[in-house]
């Protein structure tokens, strides 16, 4: 068996990955450059952020998981878009950028991380949507992922 990772460390990794994916979608900067910014920059201005927010380069965050999610989404975004398209109630280009980032990350996680139960992926996506996306985005994200899960995880 591998080393056990705390759920909070994965949660923090998802949060940072979501922010990195969102940044990449908007800026189209090089993936390695964005990853480097997240790994080295002091992102938290004390006046704007709470001192208890997680930092990326600490034991509280699974950095390998962050890297997997971020680079996996960036490298496979077209494939991921194709996987989610049948479950969307509106065209892909009409999605909010945060919803798109969250759906891409969650679909990637369902397809590539068999070590994470799909219900955990969906629940984590809902919680991230409540924090980072528009008011009712969590309902939309839940609906898409709930419909997609059976085909992405054949169990």
From Swiss-Prot:
Stored Pfam families: NusB
One GO molecular-function entry: RNA binding
A GO-annotated cellular component: cytosol
InterPro entries: NusB-like_sf, NusB_fam, NusB_RsmB_TIM44
Domain of life of the native organism: Bacteria
Record keywords: RNA-binding, Transcription, Transcription antitermination, Transcription regulation
SUPFAM superfamilies in the record: NusB-like
GO terms for biological process, alphabetical: DNA-templated transcription termination; transcription antitermination
Similarity field: Belongs to the NusB family.
Chain's role: Involved in transcription antitermination. Required for transcription of ribosomal RNA (rRNA) genes. Binds specifically to the boxA antiterminator sequence of the ribosomal RNA (rrn) operons.
UniProt-listed HAMAP family: NusB
Entries under NCBIfam families matching the protein: nusB (TIGR01951)
Name the record gives this protein: Transcription antitermination protein NusB
Organism listed in the record: Aliivibrio fischeri (strain ATCC 700601 / ES114) (Vibrio fischeri)
Lineage, top ranks: Bacteria, Pseudomonadati, Pseudomonadota, Gammaproteobacteria, Vibrionales
């Amino acid at each position: 068996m591998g080393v056990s990772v705390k759920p909070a460390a994965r949660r923090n990794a998802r949060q940072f990955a979501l922010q990195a994916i969102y940044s990449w979608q908007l800026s189209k900067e090089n993936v390695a450059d964005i990853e480097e910014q997240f790994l080295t920059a002091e992102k938290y201005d004390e006046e704007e952020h709470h001192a208890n927010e997680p930092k990326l380069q600490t034991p509280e965050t699974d950095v390998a998981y962050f890297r997997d999610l971020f680079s996996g989404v960036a490298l496979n975004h077209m494939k991921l878009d194709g996987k989610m398209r049948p479950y969307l109630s509106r065209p892909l280009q009409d999605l909010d950028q945060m919803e798109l980032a969250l759906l891409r990350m969650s679909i990637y996680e369902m397809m590539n991380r068999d070590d994470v139960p799909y219900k955990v992926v969906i629940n984590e996506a809902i919680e991230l949507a409540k924090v980072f996306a528009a008011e009712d985005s969590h309902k939309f994200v839940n609906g898409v992922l709930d419909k997609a899960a059976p085909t992405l995880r054949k169990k």
